[in-house]
Amino acid sequence: MPLVAEVPAAQPLMPVEQALERLLTLAEAAPISDTECVALAHAEGRVLACDLVASLDLPPWPNSAMDGYALRLADLQGEPLPVSQRIFAGHAPAPLQAGTCARIFTGAPMPAGADCVEMQENTQTLEDGRVRFLQALAPAQNVRPQGQETCKGEQVLAKGTRLGPIELGLAASLGHEQLQVVRRARVAVLSTGDELVEPGLPLGPGQIYNSNRRLLVSWLQRLGCEVKDMGILPDDLARTRACLAGLGDVDLILSTGGVSVGEADYLGAALREAGELALWKLAIKPGKPLTFGHYRGVPVIGLPGNPASTLVTFGLLTRPYLLRRQGVCDVTPLRFDVAAGFQWTKAGTRREYLRGRIEGGQVHIYKNQSSGVLRSAAWADGLVEVREGTTPKPGDSVSFIPLSELLG
């Protein structure tokens, strides 16, 4: 497959699945191979660079699952048993004396000779301190055996796993202070367009504030990327060339505002001088135009300029591309079916992603689905996928992708 195969003007629009497949193939051809060792405290969101193998059994010794009494089942002959010791978590017990029981607390190691634990609710303490057991017991009852969770030498996390709170907690439970992770993806973010003004500055005639820059920089940081924020590119070819010349150390150049063939497209002209670009016309709404290519060997993705289009194309296409380059295997966001609480009468030829919110067991859509309305995404908690040629009505099943799946 050519690096930047373009969709000819006369050809059908590229399905979103095909665009994603191409991007993932390109990502796999240019993996980020550099790794580094980081402390668990700084590993949130990073990608594991090698399999994590257990260096010990977990738990490392049999322990009690309950607050209660540890005993030898053979000693339970219907008579109360004296308490020979008290065992707390974090303390080594003495072997259990024959004909006795041990007061034990949750997580405390089992004493040698004991083979079961009775919870304290099923016992009665007599005036002389002996304990009467009120119910029958079975071998190993309420005992967590050594290695119940993990055995030494077992793979517990696979290479390419994104590290979240649960994975970091698991690594800590195995005694790891540091983990080997893939280097952060370095992404340069460029904005183009005479109409863009940075927040805090006065707006001129026909100008708007640059929301896409903040959207993407924040999103990339949440994905664990190292962001090189280049701001708004000037409408000057020489200055644009100079800006691009300093981006040789990044893994991706990400632009918004589109890269065209127009005479005012200084970014496109500068990129084509030392690279290759192609416009993909996608069967997706919002977000039909997507540019992919490379500049001096650095991949380039150009997202459409309308905010909702930027959100959809970054979330569904650019995000998985970046994760795959860092070695993440499963880049598919969770989705589930939910009943539509809306009527959609516009059967289109493109896959539509409506901004919606689940309320009362149904998904409702924002009143204005224009690609320029970012407020629709702030109101929503997910994207409603409307497949080509379909017109969902209230009660129909539609596919829903939570925004939380895309943003993190």
Task: Map each language-model feature to its residues.
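N-terminal intrinsically disordered, low-complexity, charge/repeat-rich segments that act as generic
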Residues: 1-24, 204, 216-223, 252, ...
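Phosphate-interaction motifs
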Residues: 2-177, 337
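Flexible glycine/proline-rich
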Residues: 17-20, 34-41, 50, 131, ...
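Solvent-exposed alpha-helices and their adjacent loops that cap or buttress functional pockets
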Residues: 62-64, 73-76, 93-97, 110-112, ...
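Short glycine-rich anion-binding loops that position phosphate/pyrophosphate groups of nucleotides
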Residues: 107-108, 194-195, 258-261, 305
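Phosphate-binding glycine-rich loops and their immediate beta-loop-alpha structural context
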Residues: 142-255
